[in-house]
């Protein structure tokens, strides 16, 4: 591939970013959405824990911080916020820093709202998921989509390496780490060598979530773009 790599593996576009940057941000959100399904208790076999959680957990919520490092290690970008998910296919991400952005899937469409610019982009969920990790939200088999391998524990965190079987996706691999019964961290390595580290706190599995959290109506005066 001859194109230049994007600035961030899970990018946070500046105000007024181009549509391509928003699409990259959406792909990052899809990755994060699918990772919500991976939070479970750490046992001797973290791979089995992952499979059990995909099967048994129907909803969840957490806070997150995210740091993206460029392939050369010179540039870093940070963001943070909260997320919620509810199977099948519904999720919500509320970014609070460095600026406010809301990403909502109602099970049919995905809405991305830049609050500062009052801009909304929308696309159908089935067009957005494809073979990405977010397909797990649609009930895909984790073993069908990924090769899983337990990795050595480090500093009290148990790790699972998930490598997509399809090689034309948005990332090379991801590592999911558990501490005790809670998701501790996720590392995503994209196809340009950029690495995203996601750290989770206040995770709650099978949480009762208000239905309206997964609904979105564009605010009055918003510029809405169908993709």
Regions found by a protein language model. Give the residues of each.
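Amphipathic hydrophobic-ligand
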Residues: 75-81, 194
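N-terminal leader/targeting segments and the immediate start of mature chains
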Residues: 2, 36, 42-76, 218-227
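Bacterial N-terminal signal peptides
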Residues: 29-39
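An acidic-aromatic
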Residues: 82-131, 196-197
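Gly/Pro-enriched, hydrophobic low-complexity segments
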Residues: 121, 141-227
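Short, solvent-exposed helix-to-loop capping segments enriched in aromatics
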Residues: 54, 129-143
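Bacterial N-terminal signal peptides that target proteins for export
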Residues: 3-30
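A generic structural motif
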Residues: 65-71, 94-96, 113-115, 163-165, ...
């Amino acid at each position: 591939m001859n194109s230049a790599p994007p600035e961030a593996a899970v990018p946070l576009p500046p105000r007024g970013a181009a549509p391509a940057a928003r699409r990259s941000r959406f792909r990052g959100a899809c990755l994060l959405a699918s990772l919500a399904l991976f939070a479970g208790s750490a046992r001797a076999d973290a791979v089995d824990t992952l499979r059990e959680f995909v099967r048994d957990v129907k909803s969840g919520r957490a806070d997150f911080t995210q740091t993206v490092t460029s392939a050369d290690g010179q540039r870093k970008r940070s963001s943070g916020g909260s997320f919620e998910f509810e199977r099948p296919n519904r999720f919500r991400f509320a970014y609070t820093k460095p600026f406010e952005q809301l990403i909502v899937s109602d099970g049919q469409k995905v809405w991305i709202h830049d609050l500062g610019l009052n801009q909304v982009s929308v696309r159908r969920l089935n067009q957005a998921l494809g073979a990405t990790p977010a397909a797990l939200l649609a009930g895909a088999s984790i073993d069908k989509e990924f090769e899983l391998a337990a990795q050595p524990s480090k500093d009290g965190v148990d790790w699972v390496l998930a490598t997509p079987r399809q090689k034309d996706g948005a990332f090379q691999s991801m590592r999911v780490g558990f501490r005790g019964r809670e998701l501790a961290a996720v590392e995503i390595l994209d196809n340009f060598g950029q690495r995203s580290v996601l750290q989770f706190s206040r995770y709650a599995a099978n949480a009762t979530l208000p239905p309206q959290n997964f609904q979105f109506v564009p605010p009055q005066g918003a510029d809405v773009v169908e993709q």
